[in-house]
Amino acid sequence: MPDGWGSLLLDRYLRIKGIDPYKISLLQRLALIGSTGRGALEYSPDFSESSNEEILNLNKLALETEKILTTDYSGDSLETLYKHGGSSGGARPKVFVTIDGKEWLIKFRAMNDPINVGEIEYKYSLLAKKCGINMPETKLFEGKYFGVERYDRTKDSRVHTVSAAGLLNADYRIPSLDYGDLLQLC
């Protein structure tokens, strides 16, 4: 199920379509995720909407995500944001896009993040690679938006993924995990 950003986006999207988000069941929400969710799971019937549009104005979308996070705004880009990642998990605003034939997850800043969070996350990814951690390609888009090549897809298949919070049954909204908890997963 979408959480954080994904739930907020889905609820706003449903409202602009004239649907009360509190009146749809969990199964109906899963049908709206359909084949567009993260990882290997797909849900039928599939009522998901996605876009194959390659070129997005990331700066405009970042501004729109700020409005959505801080107000009840449901403006021009809401449908674009929904179609490019409305089913995604996690708390931060993000989009899934195809650029030069590669599928990317590009993250935007959440309200409590430092202004340069994209650059920070990108530098962490470079450090992880220097330490020998095998991870997908990363990139800093337009100098400020962290992107990672989709790790839940290969050319021919989908890859199951699960978050540490999911494995440990931890509430992702409340910082409650430390490195000791993560090491227990190993």
Label for each model-derived stretch:
Residues 1-186:
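Phosphate/dinucleotide-binding and metal-coordinating scaffold of catalytic cores
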